[in-house]
Structure formats: structure tokens, C-alpha cells
């Protein structure tokens, strides 16, 4: 159920729409009709002709026993408008004792329009505006136009966008392939073309592997030990580089590889000596290939599977480094 103030304001609103006063528009901006927005134009044949003033009116539940609070949104340069608070200087609005319950919304708006077009120069609240108006009216007109320029822009339909966030450009989507290519160029971890040693592309490597395997097949434990030493040497010798060098310059394995018998005849420090030999040897595969020129036996299927498993393990380790 609505209160007394709401019913009175609803009556005043209907009266205002019925009379349709020229240069005055008002509408409630809250459901309880306590907050209003108002636009008042200056009267014709006055200094304020053509200017539009925007105001807010705040009513309370005590209306119409108490006057509302009226303020200008854009404070005009006017002798009867407080330059700090934006409140108009009208006696029945400033002094509750002079308020009359017979006053309505229409009477308040008409009083504001008359005050704007016919300022009272006695006891003004804006002394500077009163002084200029009395001394030089043309200068006062110029100042009024400057103060109300933003309102004139509204009439010329030159408003700024209401929501500046709508001017922000949308986020551009990027495909995964483009992202991956960009990442490969700028990431700290290089792509697969770096730090790789293609062992399977080395000439005679596969043949040498099978010959070693055949010689040491009867000593599987020793072969595994030798294989571990070779992997250790490769890990220590590998240096960061791009795969653009000649394959003849890459020394992947040593030329001197001790046999199984030598490993077991030597002292336990033999493995360390083998590692030292690997680090200092710089010759290629030529000397080793001469030792096995007459060996043409084909590897068995089981050995082929072992080779595939071994090469997969080796390539995985080197690429991950």
C-alpha cells in the first residue's frame, strides 16, 4: 500500500502532464516517486532564452508538510544559485516555515523557471554573477554560453558513447598451430632440430653394432656393461649444436673398444680407463670396419627387435636432453 506522499506526487505528476507547461519536463526516476529529474528552459526574451538547465528533486515521506530538496546537476552562473551546492535561492524551499501545503510540483517548477529568467539582485548567493550581470550584460551572456556548452552539445546530438567499454576491440583468437610455432621460436627449450644426434644416419653404425653383438653374444652381461659405458660417453661428449654439421665430423663412438676378455682380465678400474679412452679418441669408424670385413652374417630376428628397442631408447634420451 502506497503512502500519502506517493499519492500526492502521483496526483502532481498527472497535473503536470495535463497542463504541459512549455519549457518544463519532469519525470520520476524511482518506483516510490521520491526522486525526480527535471529540465527547465529559459523564458523567451530573457538572457537565458535557449538555455536548458537540468535539476534533481528529492522528496521525503513528509511531503507535502515539508519542502523537497532541489539541486542543479550543472550549476549555472546565476546570482540566485549557490555556486557550491547548486541549490536555488527560493524562500519557501530554503525556509520550511515559509512552505505551504498548497504548493505542488507544478508550482515548484514554475517558480524555478521564473527565478532563472528573472534573477533577484538583492542578497545574491553568487556575488560575482550578480556583479557582472549589473556591470556588463553582454559579457554575462558570453559566460552563460560557455557554462552551458555541454548542454548545447546534447541538443546537437554530439554525445559521447554511453558505454566506453564497447569501443574495446574484441580478443583475437589464435589457432594452436600458430601458438606452437611462436612458442618454438621464443621458448627457452628449443625444438627437436637442436641437440639431436642421429646415430642411425652414421655410416657403418648398424653393421658395427651387429658385429659387436655377435662377438659378445656369449657374454651378455659384459655386453650390457660395455653398452652402458658407451651411453655414458655419448652423454658426456654431446654438446649443444644444430644438425647442420657434416656427419663425418661427428665422433659418436670410439675406435678402441675392449673385448669381453679384456674387461674381466683387467682390474675393477678398467671401466674408468675405458671412459678415459673414449674422451680422448678422435678417430672415426675406419679402423674398426677393417676388423670385420669378412663378417657377412645376417642378424637374427631377435637381435633386430633388440636393436629397435635400443635405438628407441637412445633417441628418446638424446631428444629429451
UniProtKB/Swiss-Prot annotation:
Statement: the UniProt record of this protein carries the keyword Aminoacyl-tRNA synthetase? no
> What EC numbers are recorded for this enzyme?
2.3.2.23
- As recorded in UniProt, coiled-coil segments are none
Q: Name one Pfam family in it.
A: UQ_con
| Pathways involved | Protein modification; protein ubiquitination
**InterPro entries xrefs:** Ub_conjugating_enzyme, UBQ-conjugat_E2_core, UBQ-conjugating_AS, UBQ-conjugating_enzyme/RWD
Keyword Metal-binding listed? The answer is: no
* GO cellular component terms given for this protein: HULC complex
MF terms per GO, please?
Answer: ATP binding; ubiquitin conjugating enzyme activity
User: Gene3D superfamilies annotated for this entry?
Assistant: Ubiquitin Conjugating Enzyme
Q: Which PANTHER family match?
A: UBIQUITIN-CONJUGATING ENZYME E2
What name appears for this protein in its UniProt entry? Ubiquitin-conjugating enzyme E2 U
Q: Which organism is it from?
A: Homo sapiens
Q: What is the lineage of its organism?
A: Eukaryota, Metazoa, Chordata, Craniata, Vertebrata
Corresponding gene?
UBE2U
Amino acid at each position: 500500500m502506497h503512502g500519502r506522499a506517493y499519492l500526492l506526487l502521483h496526483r502532481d505528476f498527472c497535473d503536470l502532464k495535463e497542463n504541459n507547461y512549455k519549457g518544463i519536463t519532469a519525470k520520476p526516476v524511482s518506483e516510490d516517486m521520491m526522486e525526480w529529474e527535471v529540465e527547465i528552459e529559459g523564458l523567451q526574451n530573457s538572457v537565458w532564452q535557449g538555455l536548458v538547465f537540468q535539476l534533481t528533486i528529492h522528496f521525503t515521506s513528509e511531503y507535502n508538510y515539508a519542502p523537497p530538496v532541489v539541486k542543479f546537476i550543472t550549476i549555472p552562473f546565476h546570482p540566485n544559485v549557490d555556486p557550491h551546492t547548486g541549490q536555488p535561492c527560493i524562500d519557501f524551499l530554503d525556509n520550511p516555515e515559509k512552505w505551504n501545503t498548497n504548493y505542488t510540483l507544478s508550482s515548484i517548477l514554475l517558480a524555478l523557471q521564473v527565478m532563472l529568467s528573472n534573477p533577484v539582485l538583492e542578497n545574491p548567493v553568487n556575488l560575482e554573477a550578480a556583479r557582472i550581470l549589473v556591470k556588463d550584460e553582454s559579457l554575462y551572456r558570453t559566460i552563460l554560453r560557455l557554462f552551458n556548452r555541454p548542454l548545447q552539445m546534447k541538443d546537437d546530438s554530439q554525445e559521447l558513447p554511453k558505454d566506453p567499454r564497447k569501443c574495446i576491440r574484441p580478443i583475437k583468437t589464435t589457432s594452436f598451430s600458430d601458438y606452437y610455432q611462436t612458442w618454438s621460436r621464443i621458448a627457452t627449450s628449443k625444438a627437436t632440430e637442436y641437440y639431436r644426434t642421429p646415430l642411425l644416419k652414421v655410416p657403418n653404425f648398424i653393421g658395427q653394432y651387429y658385429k659387436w653383438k655377435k662377438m659378445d653374444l656369449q657374454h651378455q652381461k659384459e655386453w650390457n656393461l660395455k653398452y652402458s659405458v658407451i651411453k655414458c660417453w655419448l652423454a658426456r661428449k654431446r654438446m649443444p649444436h644444430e644438425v647442420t654439421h657434416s656427419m663425418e665430423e661427428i665422433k659418436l663412438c670410439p675406435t678402441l673398444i675392449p673385448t669381453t676378455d679384456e674387461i674381466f682380465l683387467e682390474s675393477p678400474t678398467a671401466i674408468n680407463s675405458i671412459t678415459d679412452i673414449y674422451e680422448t679418441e678422435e678417430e672415426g669408424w675406419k679402423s674398426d670396419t677393417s676388423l670385420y670385413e669378412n663378417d657377412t652374417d645376417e642378424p637374427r630376428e631377435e637381435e633386430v627387435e633388440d636393436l629397435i628397442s635400443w635405438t628407441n631408447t637412445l633417441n628418446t634420451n638424446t631428444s629429451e636432453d
